[in-house]
Amino acid sequence: MTRRITTLLGLAIASLTVATAAQAELRVKCEVRSDRSTASVDGKSVPNGNYYAVLTSGANSATSTAQPTIQREVEIDFSSRPRDINKGATPLAADFIVGGQATGALYTEAGALVATKTVACRVR
């Protein structure tokens, strides 16, 4: 009986994770200049809770702190600009973005992957 309940609970959790990932929309934007890198990873239509993002470009990787949703949306910023960092952006090196592209991944606070997306960065 206990094994059956455990199995059913595991299936329910797996189904919830798949449903969360299927419904979520992920927008990743990035910009690179000679003296700075900036990016944002934004989740829309995600269940209320806390989420963190991982931004990668080439061999570089940065992980944000967990941020709460506001009306089922979460916006996570990354930047090498001191002004943006002072406003809460996750710090990046000025040369963080390489090869003109970056990948953003959104995770639940518990570490479940919600969505991932690779984009070409705006080069200025």
Pin down the residues of each PLM region.
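Bacterial N-terminal signal peptides that target proteins for export
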Residues: 1-9
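Bacterial N-terminal signal peptides
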Residues: 9-17
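N-terminal signal peptide c-region/cleavage motif recognized by signal peptidases
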Residues: 19-21
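Short, surface-exposed binding/anchoring microloops in extracellular/periplasmic proteins
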Residues: 25-68
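Aromatic sugar-binding surface patches on proteins
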Residues: 35-37, 70-91
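Short, aromatic- and glycine-rich surface loops/edge beta-strands on solvent-exposed regions
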Residues: 53, 91-112
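Solvent-exposed serine/threonine-rich low-complexity stretches and specific carbohydrate-binding patches
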Residues: 60-81, 118-122
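Edge beta-strands of extracellular beta-sandwich domains
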Residues: 88-93, 111-124
